[in-house]
Regions:
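Short hydrophobic alpha-helices and adjacent helix-cap/hinge residues
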Residues: 2-4, 21-231
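Bacterial N-terminal signal peptides
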Residues: 8-18
Length: 231
């Protein structure tokens, strides 16, 4: 009789424990937000967009956030971009994300294909320019000349896109520098071989050539210059 009583108590305890586990882990529908950043994980500008989203997700159990940082040097052709997109889809849950957030114009190369994988998915583009261009130029780290530029407004006609434009104010910064340093006669821009830096170099050199011909301009690339040589 005592053994039956003990067995009953153990069974009830196990049953209660199982019910508590079920109660503490209800199946919830989680809306995932996919964030793709063309910048490094430590970039302050990129994090100013990412941090609020991740914070919101941490405070709401029905929202999840996935952040992917691109290594643009590792993407050399469209085949590698396609493979990268396949890896994205494999890492995410079976259900499509609720929306995709792109940070940095270079990340826009994924818009078209991800829209094919998840038709009409809401996309938020946070970029420095209101245009994009041929994927091949961006992947290979070449600036997009004016004749090849595609306005984001054209993409909005066929995709569910919202553009958050973050103007670089190149001309305004040049004017401010001239006011603060009246004796300035040369502008040096230090960048690398990524599309973003190459586009900045192209635009900056064109503006100086057209509006400030009295200024000398030089682009120093990390690809060909060591940090020590700058000092």
């Amino acid at each position: 009789m005592r053994s039956i009583f003990k067995a009953s108590i153990i069974f009830l305890c196990l049953l209660t424990h199982s019910l508590l586990l079920v109660g503490n882990n209800p199946e919830k529908k989680i809306d995932h937000i996919l964030i793709i950043s063309a910048y490094a994980e430590s970039n302050p500008w990129s994090n100013s967009f990412i941090t609020p989203i991740v914070t919101m997700a941490s405070q709401d159990s029905t929202i999840g956030a996935y952040t992917i940082y691109l290594n643009m040097f590792a993407l050399q052709n469209s085949r590698e971009v396609d493979k990268f997109e396949e890896n994205i889809a494999e890492k995410l849950p079976a259900s499509p994300p609720k929306m995709v957030v792109f940070i940095g114009n270079a990340s826009f190369v994924f818009c078209d294909n991800l829209n094919k994988i998840w038709p009409d998915i809401p996309m938020l583009l946070c970029g420095e320019r209101e245009y994009t261009g041929p994927d091949s130029l961006i992947i290979q780290g070449h600036a997009i000349p004016p004749k090849l530029r595609i306005p984001i407004s054209n993409l909005q006609k066929k995709m569910n896109l919202t553009m958050m434009y973050a103007n670089l104010y190149i001309e305004e910064n040049l004017q401010l520098m001239k006011r603060l340093i009246p004796q300035m006669n040369k502008v040096v821009y230090i960048g690398d071989a990524t599309y973003m830096c190459q586009q900045n170099d192209f635009d900056l050199s064109e503006i100086i050539k057209e509006k400030h011909p009295e200024l000398e301009y030089q682009f120093i690339s990390a690809q060909t210059t060591s940090t020590d040589s700058l000092f």
